[in-house]
C-alpha cells in the first residue's frame, strides 16, 4: 500500500466499520466502555457516581508501606491494581481526549483465589515497588507516558495540574532511562499476569514521544531518533498495539510529527517510523497483502483468543 496519511486511515476505518455492521450501536458501546472504567474505580468514590451499587473501597492501600496508593482502577473482576496496564489505560484515555476533544495494588495470587465485592475484600493489600536497585523501566516508562499524555489533555482546562503531571512525567522518564531493567525480572510474580514480552525499549521510546508531544522539547525528539534502531522503533513492524507492545502507537505519533511539522533535523528517521506505522494501519485495513489482521464476519479486528477485546478497543486511536 502506498503512502498513507493518518487522517486518511482514520476515515477509512470509519468507512469500513460503517459498511460492515451498520446494525450495531457504536455510540452506545462507547458509552458502555466508559461506564466500565467507572465501575472499576478504587478508593473514595464521588456521590454522583453512575454505578450506584459501587462504594468506597481499599481506603488504606499503601499505608503499610508508608505511601498513599488509594485510588486508581482494579484490574478485572479481582482487586489487584497492576500499575503497568493501568498506566497504559490512562495513556490511551488521554490520547482519546487529545484527538477527539470536541467529540468527546494487591497480591495477584491471593486475590485471584477470592472473588468478592471490592467493598468487602479481606485479602492482602501487599504493595510492590521499583527503585534504583529493583528496576522496572516498563512500569516507570509507561507511567511517564501516561502522565505526559494526561498533562497534554488537561492543559486547556487546568494549567496548574497539567504542569504538575508534566513534572512527574519528566522525573519518571529520567528514572526509567537511568536505571534500566525489566520489571518482570524484579517483580517475578508479575510474569504470571502481565509478562513483558517486548522488554522496556518500546516504553522508553513511547514515553519520550509523549514528552515531546507535551513539551515540544527537541531533546525528546533527538532521543527517539538516536535510539530508533537500537530500541527497535524503526525495526518492529507490528500488527498489534496493546499494554505490552507500544511500537505501533509511537510509530503513529511520530508519523504525525513528521506530517505536521516536518522536523527537518530528524525527518529521515521519522520517515522510517512512518513506514512502520503504515504497515500497522494497512494491516488493520486489510490492505497489507497477506499480512493483515484477522477480522470476524461482523467486522471486529481479531488478534488473539485470550481477551481479544483489549486489542480492537485501542487500535482506532492510533489508526
Question: Where do the PLM segments sit?
Answer:
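Glycan-recognition and catalytic cores of secretory/periplasmic carbohydrate-active enzymes
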Residues: 22-319
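Bacterial N-terminal signal peptides that target proteins for export
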Residues: 1-8
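N-terminal signal peptide
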Residues: 11-27
Amino acid at each position: 500500500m502506498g503512502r498513507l496519511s493518518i487522517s486518511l486511515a482514520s476515515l477509512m476505518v470509519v468507512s469500513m466499520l460503517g459498511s460492515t455492521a451498520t446494525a450495531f450501536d457504536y455510540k452506545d458501546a462507547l458509552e458502555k466502555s466508559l461506564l466500565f472504567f467507572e465501575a472499576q474505580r478504587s478508593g473514595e468514590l464521588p456521590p454522583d457516581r453512575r454505578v450506584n451499587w459501587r462504594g468506597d473501597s481499599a481506603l488504606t492501600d499503601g499505608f503499610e508501606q508508608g505511601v498513599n496508593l488509594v485510588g486508581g482502577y482494579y484490574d478485572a473482576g479481582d482487586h489487584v491494581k497492576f500499575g503497568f496496564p493501568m498506566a497504559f489505560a490512562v495513556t490511551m484515555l488521554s490520547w482519546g481526549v487529545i484527538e477527539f476533544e470536541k467529540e468527546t495494588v494487591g497480591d495477584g495470587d491471593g486475590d485471584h483465589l477470592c472473588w468478592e465485592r471490592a467493598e468487602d475484600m479481606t485479602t492482602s493489600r501487599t504493595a510492590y515497588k521499583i527503585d534504583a536497585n529493583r528496576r522496572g523501566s516498563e512500569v516507570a516508562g509507561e507511567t511517564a507516558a501516561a502522565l505526559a499524555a494526561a498533562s497534554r489533555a488537561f492543559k486547556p482546562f487546568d494549567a496548574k495540574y497539567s504542569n504538575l503531571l508534566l513534572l512527574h512525567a519528566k522525573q519518571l522518564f529520567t528514572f526509567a532511562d537511568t536505571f534500566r531493567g525489566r520489571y518482570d525480572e524484579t517483580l517475578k510474580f508479575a510474569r504470571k499476569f502481565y509478562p513483558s514480552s517486548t522488554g522496556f525499549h518500546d516504553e522508553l521510546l513511547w514515553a519520550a514521544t509523549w514528552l515531546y508531544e507535551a513539551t515540544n522539547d527537541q531533546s525528546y525528539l533527538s532521543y527517539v531518533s538516536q535510539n530508533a534502531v537500537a530500541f527497535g522503533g524503526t525495526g518492529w513492524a507490528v500488527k498489534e498495539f496493546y499494554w505490552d507492545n507500544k511500537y505501533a502507537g509511537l510509530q503513529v505519533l511520530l508519523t504525525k510529527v513528521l506530517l505536521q511539522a516536518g522536523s527537518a533535523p530528524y525527518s529521515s528517521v521519522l520517515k522510517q517510523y512512518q513506514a512502520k506505522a503504515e504497515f500497522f494501519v494497512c494491516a488493520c485495513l486489510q490492505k497489507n497483502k497477506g499480512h493483515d489482521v484477522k477480522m470476524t464476519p461482523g467486522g471486529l479486528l481479531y488478534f488473539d483468543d485470550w481477551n481479544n477485546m483489549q486489542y480492537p478497543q485501542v487500535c482506532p486511536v492510533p489508526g
